[in-house]
């Protein structure tokens, strides 16, 4: 089975009437995701027109939407200034799985949100992430559905576009994926590498794992230690930013080298010490996986 979501996951879209929310809601519906409703304050009672004559109701609040639809997941396409409140509203409404796509949420907001989400017992993916996709089952977020293939490789990444690149490499070489997860590149995120590694380790349909990290922080080193101690499946890793200069932010808010711990070389060395096969470039993934398996 996939991790975190499956073909029965019932999804709400917060911000469904906005430009991004409406576009990606239709994309998710076309993929086959069970989208059961949307939430936009002031638009309650209206309907959202999906592809092929389908439609779903729009609600004013998350509490109302969850009560009416029984949704067990939500995805957030809300502007940064309001996204923290949207996450907290979802957690307060009892949604167990929250995916925050929004980029640019202030770190101080997330410092307030993350403890609240944990207190409510919800799982948060993101923010500033592409979401996740279980090939042939469900898609939540912005990952393109046409590059995936059903299979047994779990993919977890801090980078959205690098996820797409590596998944494309796998699919074109007839290597399918069990679940592809983008955890996001902000300094404060919910679900992390270790959470995903643990889930993939427990998943009977995942035979090997691809982990894509980047410069900044020590999440990759922590994940490598977890792999060494707890993961028996083959793991292949890549670190983005191998030529990045220290002190300069590279794309993500969290992708900045501060001291030796955040460098690509330090992270790759931690991978090697944990028995993780290390890619020098994304196109190495196919050969390394085949060798590992």
Role assignments for model-derived ranges:
Residues 1-293:
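Catalytic-core regions of core metabolic enzymes
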């Amino acid at each position: 089975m996939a991790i975190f979501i499956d073909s029965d996951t019932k999804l709400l879209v917060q911000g469904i009437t906005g430009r991004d929310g409406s576009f990606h809601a239709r994309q998710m519906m076309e993929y086959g995701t069970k989208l059961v409703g949307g939430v936009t304050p002031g638009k309650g009672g209206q309907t959202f027109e999906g592809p092929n004559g389908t439609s779903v109701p729009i609600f004013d609040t998350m509490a109302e939407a969850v009560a009416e639809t029984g949704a067990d997941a939500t995805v957030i396409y809300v502007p940064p200034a309001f996204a923290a409140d949207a996450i907290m509203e979802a957690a307060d409404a009892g949604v167990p799985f929250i995916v925050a796509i929004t980029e640019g949420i202030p770190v101080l907001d997330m410092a307030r949100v993350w403890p609240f989400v944990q207190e409510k017992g919800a799982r948060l993916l993101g923010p500033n992430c592409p979401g996740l996709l279980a090939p042939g089952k469900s898609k939540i977020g912005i990952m393109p559905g046409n590059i995936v293939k059903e299979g047994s490789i779990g993919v977890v990444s801090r980078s959205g576009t690098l996820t797409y690149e590596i998944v494309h490499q796998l699919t074109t070489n007839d290597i399918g994926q069990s679940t592809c997860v983008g955890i996001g590149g902000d300094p404060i995120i919910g679900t992390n590498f270790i959470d995903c590694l643990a889930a993939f380790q427990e998943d009977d349909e995942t035979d090997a794992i691809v982990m894509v990290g980047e410069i900044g922080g020590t999440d990759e080193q922590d994940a490598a230690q977890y792999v060494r101690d707890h993961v028996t499946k083959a793991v292949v890793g890549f670190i983005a930013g191998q030529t990045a200069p220290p002190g300069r932010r590279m794309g993500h808010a969290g992708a900045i080298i501060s001291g030796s711990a955040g460098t690509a070389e330090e992270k790759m060395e931690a991978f090697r010490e944990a028995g993780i096969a290390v890619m020098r470039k994304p196109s190495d993934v196919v050969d390394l996986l085949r060798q590992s398996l």
